[in-house]
Amino acid sequence: MARITVEDCLNQIPNRFKLTLAATYRARELAQGHAPRLDSKDKPTVTALREIASGLTGLEMLRKVPT
C-alpha cells in the first residue's frame, strides 16, 4: 500500500488551510455515498487525500459549499 503524505497534497493545494477544507468536504461527500474518482478501498478521508494528491480533486470543492 502506498502511503499518502501531506506534502503530496500541498503540491496541488499550497495553502494548508484550504487543503484541509477541501479534503474535509470531499471526504464528507464520499462518506455520504458519492462515487470515488479513483479506485480505492481506503476510508473516505484517505481516498479524499489520494484524489487531491493525484489532481482529481482540488479547490473546486470550496466553490461548491453554499454560503
Swiss-Prot record:
Domain of life (superkingdom): Bacteria
Catalyzed reactions per annotation: RNA(n) + a ribonucleoside 5'-triphosphate = RNA(n+1) + diphosphate
EC number in record: 2.7.7.6
GO cellular component, one term: DNA-directed RNA polymerase complex
A Pfam cross-reference name: RNA_pol_Rpb6
GO terms for MF: DNA binding; DNA-directed RNA polymerase activity
Keyword Secreted found: no
Signal sequence coordinates: none
Keywords annotated in UniProt: DNA-directed RNA polymerase, Nucleotidyltransferase, Transcription, Transferase
Cross-referenced SUPFAM superfamilies: RPB6/omega subunit-like
Keyword Transferase: yes
Any Gene Ontology biological process: DNA-templated transcription
Subunit composition and interactions: The RNAP catalytic core consists of 2 alpha, 1 beta, 1 beta' and 1 omega subunit. When a sigma factor is associated with the core the holoenzyme is formed, which can initiate transcription.
Family recorded in the similarity comment: Belongs to the RNA polymerase subunit omega family.
Free-text function comment from the UniProt entry: Promotes RNA polymerase assembly. Latches the N- and C-terminal regions of the beta' subunit thereby facilitating its interaction with the beta and alpha subunits.
PANTHER family, per database record: DNA-DIRECTED RNA POLYMERASE SUBUNIT OMEGA
Name of this chain's protein: DNA-directed RNA polymerase subunit omega
Native organism: Bordetella avium (strain 197N)
